[in-house]
């Protein structure tokens, strides 16, 4: 059974989330503080997705997200944000989250986002016949879901991996934000297009020699992005 960490300090919200995730067939691990969540991750290595509230009584959800990313880049992370806090969404994505859900949210929206994230993190994928994509100086191993630049490993989240894979398999092709969203997040994802832009910004910091002057992931103004100038 797929295991999810639920970090939420308000017990009624946490119970609502847990009940609906269990109804959808997921196993849950609960935490009410950031430190408790980090401890649960160490005790439960089978956790593949984490739902993180931002406002917590000890360390906030952003710091928990940073620490999770330092421990494991393969865990999918969804931030639970207030609808009015636009900067929380951007900050969460830049600290390593894969997605966000704004409060209040419906059970269908929450479970849909979780299901889509499990799919993107590779749990439901079959191994591919061609296990390497090479675009110098990059080498993408689709079997291990890893990226190297000049022989050095680049640490990617699973969403970042999906974006790089899409670009490297379509070199020189302009891809719209909508195409990227559909390919990486899935056609059933109904989030905002800005999630593409924020993930591209984060990805450039990791793979470009100068993120302010990108040469690998370039902008196609008014449309989207492409691999190469």
What feature does the model see in each segment?
Residues 108, 173-184:
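Short coil-to-helix segment of the ABC ATPase nucleotide-binding domain corresponding to the Q-loop/switch region
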């Amino acid at each position: 059974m797929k295991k999810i960490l639920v970090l939420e300090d308000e017990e009624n919200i946490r119970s609502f989330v847990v009940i609906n995730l269990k109804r959808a067939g997921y196993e849950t691990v609960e935490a009410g503080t950031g430190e408790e969540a980090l401890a649960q991750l160490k005790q439960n290595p089978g956790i593949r997705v984490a739902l993180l509230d931002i406002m917590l009584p000890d360390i906030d959800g952003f710091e928990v997200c940073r620490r999770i990313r330092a421990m494991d880049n393969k865990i999918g992370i969804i931030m639970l944000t207030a609808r009015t806090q636009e900067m929380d969404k951007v900050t969460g994505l830049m600290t390593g989250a894969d997605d966000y859900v704004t409060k209040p949210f419906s059970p269908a929206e929450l479970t849909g986002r979780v299901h889509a994230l499990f799919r993107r993190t590779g749990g439901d994928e079959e191994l591919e016949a061609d296990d390497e994509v090479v675009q110098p100086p990059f080498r993408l191993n689709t079997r291990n879901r890893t990226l190297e630049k000049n022989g050095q490993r680049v640490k990617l989240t699973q969403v970042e991996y999906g974006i790089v894979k899409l670009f490297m398999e379509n070199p020189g092709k302009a891809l719209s934000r909508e195409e990227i969203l559909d390919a990486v997040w899935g056609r059933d994802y109904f989030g905002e297009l800005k999630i593409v832009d924020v993930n591209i910004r984060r990805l450039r910091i990791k793979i470009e020699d100068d993120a302010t002057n990108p040469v690998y992931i370039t902008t196609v103004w008014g449309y989207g992005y492409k691999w190469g100038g």
